[in-house]
């Protein structure tokens, strides 16, 4: 999948997935389309965008706020927020232009305890940290190498959440588990980055 971030004023992108687009333009199914906001729009423009999204029946064009992205990037204190960030197609990873994320997946089983998940997250984080050292890309511009060396983004994803008694609920216990798991990933990454002689991931 790809993501397309367009200007708010781009009417062609606004309606790219309206009507029966899949009959005449089936390749559009491969991209998620969003408007990239660089400032707060006035209410009339904002409502027009929402109305267009509703009428498209496709859930697009979505909304991506670059100002909010900069604030989020600055939260950890490890990441330089002075970029016009984009995002991956699912919208959970902030990316520089020519940026990438080293993804690993944790499979959650229904009976997993917090300790079980900590161990799985640890292994996934170690794998992602090692993967981030593979930064000498051939056949692409050097900026890809530079960004990977500087940021070493990790994505420790979890699948099977809805099968789990604790994590499938919107509860304070689930929130606490997720906070602990993320903190553990950050700690493990810092330890292994030091062992490998590389910088810590700026975001996990």
What is each of the regions a protein language model found here?
Residues 55-168:
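Function-dense linear segments that define catalytic or interfacial modules
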Residues 45, 49, 102, 116-119, ...:
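Exposed alpha-helical structural elements
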Residues 1-40, 132-145, 149, 153, ...:
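Internal maturation/activation junctions in enzymes
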Residues 39, 46-50, 55-56, 62, ...:
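Conserved mixed alpha/beta core segments that line enzyme active sites in large multi-domain catalysts
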